[in-house]
Structures are given as structure tokens and as C-alpha cells.
């Protein structure tokens, strides 16, 4: 495969007689292209060619293992077309690097896996839950968006759906955001399905282990693959079910070109394989809800009485909730301690969860006078303080130290904390609650499970440990840091983070209380209080549809120097009212937190241009951009190549 976009096409080669038996569709080969040897895959064998010139000869077969199956090739083509990418970029995500020793290992012949009986009672609490399991048992292509109840052991429900599908003779693919979720689902799945038939794929595996497990899926010995985002391309045949947990987690968005989202790839795969699909989570994204609204998927949601019985009591604590007479400093205090200290959670021996948006000490700084965010002078990354005795602010992107902070907007040298991190919060709690154990779970220091007993747990979103019997209470801090972001998904992301934490708290009948430090009138806070993720997703989808934002439309973001972006638009002939009804929006600045495209000098200004089309014209927009990228690629040399970064429906639009 060739890395330059204008050569992203098939090439014909002659096959020498000595390689004819091994050079079958799907195998890796080496061919000579413009005088150099390059890697490739055999796509098909034909007796003739449409090429009228002289054909070159295949140099050698790297391995007779057919790693690029017909199903995965179709998926690669579809993803490249959907995201305006090259097949080479998608193949880099889909097919891992070869490990010769692993290929030579003898694989046991796949047999029928041992599957324990599935108890459907866990799904009975949900409308259409039993019907969904029954459809999987009959190998029907049932598609559902599942709203997990608070306190639900989601991995058990996923494992039951997987076991039901494997028992029916089909394979299953389950995608989760991170290693911790993978471990949780692995433990639940192997309790029902023979461990030798279950494979886990994640980025943390070494090349040898990853390729061994990937081959187990290819050769048919694995019937259930659990993995993080890139595992969505696992080469399973007879696919019966594709599952995605917590599709709101941005870990499922691939940071490498062409930047596909695992949820979208999974749904593409379910459509191509005509198999069942399941998206689950405590909260719901507008994209998942759009699948329900379109009729492509069904709702699997518990009735309201069951939701109320299983959810904790949620209290919003705004400024009017502070008692100035009792605590004059409470109105400006970050930890409204007396309000939740008065609860009985710690006294009863239950742990209390404190969720903060960011890890570290003070991960974000701003000017004390004009409130402009403090950014690195080198790469424009956010500046942070690493500890109480830090010699200066440190860039979270490039690591440069700025010992003399001065605002680039107003010149002030006074700074303030925008967000207080988990480490600083733990310090504050330690002083406020002497004698109580304070546990921090954030960043590289993750605590998967708590021991029984009272404790204060400070955790960042997604790092919350599970507690035996659930937490007695939870405090959700710095809500403005989530809701106040200038981002399309700010409200959706905040609700997902809050509900993921609140789902770990005991039901209201057992005394569970969640306190969110936010104005109770905010619609997102109201959705948390009512525990209504479906209603929030419905409102979010309606609002985006009204103003023309994804998922009601497709948007392409073009990032790069102004001249190169303009050249791409001209090469792609966009916008073109006669061919494609596209709205051109911008130029705008890159959204906060979005890195600059690679290869562009640090001092070169970067803009973002947006192209918006209706849902029906998404593939046509991507095709136009692919053609334009190919034209630019053909014009440029290796020394001058500076292509625009193209993202279709990026998470952060600006």
C-alpha cells in the first residue's frame, strides 16, 4: 500500500509460477513500484488486466496467511469512503504488523465453545429486554440502544447478550473505551463463555501478543472478541452481534487519520454483516438517539418506576444553597463541606465519591485580570501547575516551563486557577476531614476496586473505583468547567460523566445521595436530577437539528494554513451548488484543546474551514474531498507536502 493519496488505487501485477499457490487474495506481498519495494495485499486473482501498458512482476509473498478477508476489505473501503481517507490509513488501523513466529504456531482447530445457560432476568427490567435476547438466540439482526439503570452491572448484561449469540453459533464483537472496562467485561464474559473462545485486544498488548490474539479471531478459534477502539476491525467471520459500551467516551474516537469513531465503524459493520447491534451506556449520545429516531434501532429502556427505585437522590447545590450565616466563606468555597458532611454516609461506614473534571494539581490557569486562558508561547497548549512548590507553569502538551507568566492579552502577571485537579482536591479534603482515608484515582494511578469501609475517594471521570455495596454519597465538583466549554458536546459530555459517577451510588431507598454543584435550573442538571438521559438526548438532537449540526448533518473540518485549505477547496470544486449543496463556514480558529496538524511549523497560522451538507450527501462530500486531496498530493513534492487535515464529523467542531 502506498502512503500518498493520489496513488490510493489498485495496481495489476503478474504472478510468477513459483508464487502462484501462495499469492491468494488477502495475503501480504512485496512488489516493486517506481524502483523501490513496497508492501501490499493481493485483492483478487484474474486472468486478464485492464492495464494496457507493461505489467511488473510480484516480487515475493511475505506470508501465505490471508490476513485481509473479504469482509474486512469491504469495511476498510466503506470507512475510507465515509471519512474521506485513504485505504492505506484504514488498513494501518485494521491489520496489525506481522509477527512471523506467531504465524508459525500451530492453532488448535476451532470447536464448539462451551457456553453456560443465560439467565434472562437481568434484561427483564427493561422494555424489550427479553425480546432482544430472544432475537439473538434466533440469530436475528436485532438492533438496540440500551439505557443501563444506575447500579447496573453493565458487563453482566453485555456478557449475557454475547453468550446468547455464541450459543447460536455466531461470533460477537464488543468494543469498550479503555482497559479497565475491557477487564471488567472479560471477567463477566469468561464466566459464561469458554475462556479459550474469548480474546481481548487492546493497545497495551505487545506486538507478539496482539498478533497472536488477532490470528485467533482470523482463524476461527475466537468466538468473542473484546477490545478497545481498533478492535472494531477484528477479522471475525459469521458475525452475529456488535456491541459498543459508553459511546460518549472520546477514547472511542481514533486520533489517527482518517479519524473514524468506533461507534460509526461498528454500525457500518453491523449493516454490512446484517447482524445484531447493541449500543449501551448510562447516558445517551445524540448519535445513538438518532439511530432510534430513524428506526434503525429500538429503545431498550426501563420503565420510570424502576428508574426511580434504582437511582440515587440527586440534589443540585447552587449559590442559594450556601448558608452565609453559618459559614460566611461558603459562597465562594469550592467544597461545600458542611452540606454533605452532615450526611450519614461516612458515619455509616460507606465511602463517599468526589468527582473532579481533571487530574493533576492545577491543570488549567487563566489571567487574574481579564480571565484569558494561559497558553504556551511555543505550541499554544494549556499551562498548568504541577504542585504547591512548582517553579513555574508547565505546558500540558509540549512540557515547556514558563517561569514568568504574563498575559498576552492585557499584560497582567496575576494568575488564577481555572480548574482544580484531583491531587489538589485530595489535599483540601485531607485538611477538611482529618482522620478519614482519602484515596485518589486519576491518570496513571487508577484504583479499580475499594475495600469495605469509610473513605473519601477523589476521582476523575472514568477513573471512579467500584465500591462494595455502592457509594453512600457522591459530590460532583466544578460543573461549570464541563458545562461552560465552548463545545458542541459540552452538555452531553457533562451528563455522561455525571451519570457514570452517580450510577455507582446506592439507590435512594438505601440512602444514596448525589450532590452536583450547579444551578438546578440548567437543563442538563435537571436531566440528572430526574435521571432522564433519553429526554436529554432527544432535546440535544432536536436542538442540533434546528441549527444544522451533527448528527442531523455531516460536517467536514479542514485544518491547515489558509492557502492550503483554499487550494483543497478549489481542487475539490467545493462548494458547487450545481453538484453538492454544501455550506461553507469559516474560517474559524481551532477549538480549544485541538492540536495543530502535524508537520506545520509552529509559527505558521492555522485556520479551520467547515463544510456542511445534509445527511444524504455525506458520502458525496467525502468523495469530493478525497479527489481534492489526491489532486493536491499529485502536485506536491516530498519537501513541500503539507496536506490539510480533513475530519468528517469531528468530536470538537469549534
From Swiss-Prot:
Keyword flag DNA-binding: yes
Keyword hit for DNA-binding: yes
Transmembrane segments: none
GO biological process: DNA recombination; DNA replication initiation; DNA replication, synthesis of primer; double-strand break repair
Gene3D superfamilies linked: P-loop containing nucleotide triphosphate hydrolases, PriA, 3(prime) DNA-binding domain
Gene Ontology terms: cellular component: primosome complex
Positions contributing to Zn(2+) 1 binding: 367, 370, 407, 410
Cofactor binding, per record: Binds 2 zinc ions per subunit.
Binding site for Zn(2+) 2: 376, 379, 395, 398
Keyword field: ATP-binding, DNA replication, DNA-binding, Metal-binding, Nucleotide-binding, Primosome, Zinc
Domain of life assignment: Bacteria
Gene Ontology MF annotations: 3'-5' DNA helicase activity; ATP binding; DNA binding; hydrolase activity; zinc ion binding
The protein's required cofactors: Zn(2+)
Quaternary assembly: Component of the replication restart primosome.
Family annotation (HAMAP family): PriA
Annotated family: Belongs to the helicase family. PriA subfamily.
Role summary: Initiates the restart of stalled replication forks, which reloads the replicative helicase on sites other than the origin of replication. Recognizes and binds to abandoned replication forks and remodels them to uncover a helicase loading site. Promotes assembly of the primosome at these replication forks.
Name of protein: Probable replication restart protein PriA
Species the sequence originates in: Mycobacterium tuberculosis (strain CDC 1551 / Oshkosh)
Lineage: Bacteria, Bacillati, Actinomycetota, Actinomycetes, Mycobacteriales
